A protein has these predicted regions:
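RNA-contacting regions in translation and RNA-metabolism proteins
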Residues: 1-186
Length: 186
């Protein structure tokens, strides 16, 4: 059963990320109990997900039930959650870097602006790595920028990490973002 659940979870994530591109999805958490499937969607713009009078949520639920072949409609529950700060979500920050690189903006400038924005939002540290044919160069290279502290060997720190490829006109550029949100209460 575990194998089927993992495949189903991947399908759910894929469908939701595809459907909610403009809503700014930063994280999708899936909880399963014996007869319930709860999907928590962390969104920057919940209005796009919910729609007028909750119609968007109902449509999304019907679409997921159809795609996943769920027989009982009460099994699936979608719970939208609002993100306090979009600049503290590594996925949304990386997505903004990707969009700017695709628009052919200078990689150095993009990294500097993003680092300033994230640090102003209240992060303890941030690190961005771009690798590939940056700026359409013939020889691939790796660019790194960091600010604040980024202790990657410490389990007490809440570090958000994501890696996303950016398809530019001259090829792929890998974008990696680490954001240190501070210490976690254990």
């Amino acid at each position: 059963k575990y194998k089927e659940y993992v495949i189903e979870d991947l399908k759910i994530r894929q469908i939701l990320l595809e459907k909610l591109k403009n809503a700014g999805v930063s994280d999708i958490q899936i909880e399963r109990s014996s007869n319930k499937l709860k999907v928590f969607i962390y969104v920057a713009r919940p209005g796009i997900l919910i729609g007028r009078g909750g119609t968007g949520l109902d449509e999304l639920k019907k679409f997921l039930i159809l795609k996943l072949n769920i027989k009982d409609k009460n099994v699936l529950e979608i719970v939208p959650r609002d993100i306090k700060s979009t600049d503290l979500s590594a996925y949304l920050v990386a997505q903004s870097v990707v969009e700017q690189l695709v628009k052919r903006m200078s990689a150095q400038r993009v990294m500097n602006q993003v680092i300033d924005r994230v640090m102003r939002a209240g992060a303890k540290g941030v690190r961005i790595v771009l690798s590939g044919r940056i700026g359409g160069a013939d020889i691939a290279r790796r660019e790194r920028k960091a600010a604040g502290v980024m202790p990657l060997h410490t389990l007490r720190q809440d570090i958000d990490f994501v890696s996303i490829p950016a398809m530019t006109k001259r090829g792929y550029v890998g974008v990696k973002v680490w954001i240190n949100k501070g210490e976690v209460e254990i």
